[in-house]
Amino acid sequence: MYSEIFDFLPPERIKINEPMKEHSSFKIGGPVDLMVLPESIEEIQRITHYCRKKDIPCFVFGLGSNILVRDKGIRGVAIKVGNNLKNISICNDTIFAEAGVRLAELSQAAADYSLSGLEFAEGIPGSLGGAVVMNAGAYGGEMKDVLKEVRAITPDGNLSSFKPEEMKLRYRGSIFQEEELIVVSALMQLHKERAEDIRARMQDFAKRRREKQPLEYPSAGSTFRRPAGFFVGPMIEEMGLKGFKVGGAEVSRKHAGFIINSGNATANEVLELIAIVKAKAKEHYGIELETEVKVVGEE
């Protein structure tokens, strides 16, 4: 079934029945049938083409910082971009980076060249590709503010460029979520500023994260999208759910907007806890909470 993949990728970049919990910041998830670690855009194109030709399910992810993999795992092929595709180049006030670059590394690189605009990304886990797909943001900044061009592989296997007006960037969403597009690189427009001012903002954001977020536990970041007119953390706290647990899944005592893995949690436990929080929000506030975490895998 996967013979052609074994023909063009070396065995050290192919993993059979790989536990997804080893590739997720939640530290949760069953095995994927086959995980591949491409080192170039061409390899991604070849793998996805093969999967389409053979009608094999294909899941592409970066560093697994915003996913919850179900306990039965993932059928088909998982393409992990976050291990490789890490090139960065800087020209004047623009940065080109491939999808596998860590956001923290990208924001540090910008600061090294006295370029402002990516300070908000300091401390956000995950890769550039995932950040583009969900228009990641924090502390008043988001990817939408800096993206100048994005390259992505289309469903027919071609490489296409997208300008900002074509990306449909919005709060935690983009065209790359809506359509079968695989982000492989981005060009970002920044602006010159004093390096010490940039680093001061980054240090402030990092300090605030350490103080307010449960970074000491595995999680997938903020569990829920922010509904209009509300802040999720205080809302969940007011409902009396701070510290509420289902097995090893827990509403964080430090920040109720985070569901954490407090010890050997299963995906089913996390999903049950999410359902409880959503039901309470509907009952107390008449709000349909939406998850920010992407749930993947076999039910």
From Swiss-Prot:
Where is the protein found, in the record's own terms? Cytoplasm
Predominant location of this chain?
Answer: cytoplasm
Per the UniProt entry, the Enzyme Commission number(s) are 1.3.1.98
Cystine residue pairs? none
Pathway membership, UniProt: Cell wall biogenesis; peptidoglycan biosynthesis
- Give a yes or no for keyword Flavoprotein in this entry: yes
GO cellular component terms, alphabetically, are: cytosol
Q: Which residue positions are annotated as catalytic?
A: R172, S222 (proton donor), E292
Obligatory cofactor(s): FAD
Function in brief = Cell wall formation.
Q: Which NCBIfam families match?
A: murB, PRK13905.1
What protein name does the entry list?
Answer: UDP-N-acetylenolpyruvoylglucosamine reductase
Organism field: Syntrophomonas wolfei subsp. wolfei (strain DSM 2245B / Goettingen)
Report which gene this protein is encoded by: murB
